[in-house]
Swiss-Prot record:
Organism superkingdom: Bacteria
Name this polypeptide is given: Glycerol-3-phosphate acyltransferase
Presence of the UniProt keyword Membrane in the record: yes
InterPro entries: G3P_acylTferase_PlsY
CC annotations in GO: plasma membrane
Main subcellular localisation: membrane
Chain's gene name: plsY
GO molecular-function terms, A-Z: acyl-phosphate glycerol-3-phosphate acyltransferase activity
Source organism: Geobacter sulfurreducens (strain ATCC 51573 / DSM 12127 / PCA)
SMART domains according to UniProt: G3P_acyltransf
Entries under HAMAP family matching the protein: PlsY (MF_01043)
Length: 194
């Protein structure tokens, strides 16, 4: 049990690394003071361009994926795999390095989900791409894909603890998008420009 506790704590710390903030700072920008003020990949992309935005997306995704893969490699049971994945995600959303104020968690959740159920991610990703291609709203695609993810995991994995973890993550992602939801309702949400 000691190994499981250690990896869960490490996953939270790894998840807490503010990838977007660090990459933006390396470019001479405080990402919290530009655009939406969010440290996630979408704001970094809009502010600093494709290269830094994609690097942020990949870094945030890896923060969720790597701890889950390590937990699986070490043979952790589902409760601990779920704990490690949730810890990495919570680290990103409530980072210790920024006073427990982090990103919205979409990319880190993607990494966790890739480690838990890659086939489920394909369904959610197809949904995300379809919505963004149709509406040009990344936030709407993220919200709907997050809401659908527990259903995909339930259908593919049929493992209650992993479904439960996915549901908790999905709810937090949606709650973190409450301002986006308000702007979508008001018609003031920014559309994605390739």
């Amino acid at each position: 049990m000691l190994n499981e506790l250690i990896l869960t704590a490490v996953a939270y710390i790894v998840g807490s690394i503010p990838t977007g903030l660090l990459l933006a700072r390396a470019s001479g920008v405080d990402i919290r003071a530009t655009g939406s003020g969010n440290i996630g990949a979408t704001n970094v992309y809009r502010t600093l361009g494709r290269t830094v935005g994609i690097a942020t997306l990949l870094g945030d995704c890896l923060k969720g994926l790597v701890p889950v893969l390590v937990a699986r490699k070490l043979g952790f049971a589902d409760p601990w795999v779920a704990a490690v994945g949730l810890a990495a995600f919570l680290g990103h959303v409530y980072t210790i390095f920024l006073g427990f104020k982090g990103g919205k968690g979409v990319a880190t959740a993607l990494g966790v989900f890739l480690g838990v159920s890659p086939l489920s991610v394909l369904g959610a990703l197809a949904l995300f791409i379809g919505i963004v291609a149709t509406t040009r709203y990344i936030s709407l695609g993220s919200i709907i894909a997050a809401a659908a993810m527990p259903l995909f995991v339930a259908a593919v994995e049929r493992r209650p603890l992993l479904v439960g973890m996915t549901l908790v993550i999905a709810v937090i992602v949606i709650v973190k998008h409450r301002e986006n939801i308000r702007r979508l309702r008001e018609g003031t949400e920014n559309r994605f420009k390739a």
